[in-house]
Amino acid sequence: MMRSWVSLILAAGLVACHTEMMKVTELKAIPDAAYAKGVSAPFCGVVGDALVVAGGANFPDKSLLDGGAKRVYADIWAQADGEWVHAGVLPDSTAYGATFAVDGALVLAGGNVCGTTTDKVYELTFRDRAAVLRALPPLPVPMEQCGWTRDGDRLYLVGGVGTTGVYACTVGEYVWTKLADLPEPLVQPVAFASAGKLYVWGGFNPETLEVSDKGLVIPTDSSVIPSEAKESPWAEAPAIPDGGTFVGATGATLPDGRLVVVGGVNRAIFARALHNTPEDRIPYLSKEPAEYQFRQAVYAFDPAAGAWTLLGSDPACALAGPGVAVRPQGGLYVAGGELKPGVRSPRIFSLAW
């Protein structure tokens, strides 16, 4: 969630009527004292057959409720054959960035470094089980808590803290150009690109404090469209299922072309919390995790059908800011995330259906 007080608290679309059988399989946690309390908003992806979790943030010493300080990490952990290896460190301690899986590597873009939004981008590969990092061209503007997605050889970054920009680059070149501006500022949206269209769902407006349940779509072959254009290039997309939001959720594109979204806050509870006063802080942070009603349901969006499908629901998925990556064997990995404001989960598990 965001670092300020706003961050501490942080039209239903078409939904297919059937539910697929979802299986949750527990995996080994990262064997490190700093990660024992879990992290949220890490870089997370798969290189070869190895799950990679890097960076992330938590409150290791004292809880947020007790005035604890957030710590951001630089560690790079890789799991292959069921065992975790400390594979190296990031150039900076980073959380809230974007992760792209690209041809035997991960591209790590933006994030928050020591309280400052960064424009840095790195390629992460492995040599003899050790992480190798190569600096790529920086982003046009610093970005964190943005939406991100890949479609073919194109990567997209959408919104986040301090920008309404939508940016794209080509894999291998990594020179980012601006496609358009969002209709409004959106922090923590979920993005998805398919068949020449870029979709954006959820997010919250840090200026109006409104929490979006809407979907937006724009052609990805558009030239740059100024924000002051008389006609918006954005059209409505099928809204978020159940009238909720995807603030705090993480999306991943499956090999079959569907978007799967895991986690996220409860829209109504989060919207009320955005208006909390300092006097509300202790009562709000003192609640049990279940009282925040983070989303347990996992949904998939099929761009061909233009509809959402409920894949399943499990309390393990009630997380904000989890790392999510596509498993080579099918399904997803889910790593860490927030159980409630300031409290992380150390669990790492897979989802299959």
Regions from the language model: what does each represent?
Residues 15-16:
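C-terminal motif of bacterial Sec signal peptides marking the signal peptidase cleavage site
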Residues 20-353:
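Kelch-like beta-propeller repeat domains
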Residues 2-11:
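Sec-dependent signal peptide recognition
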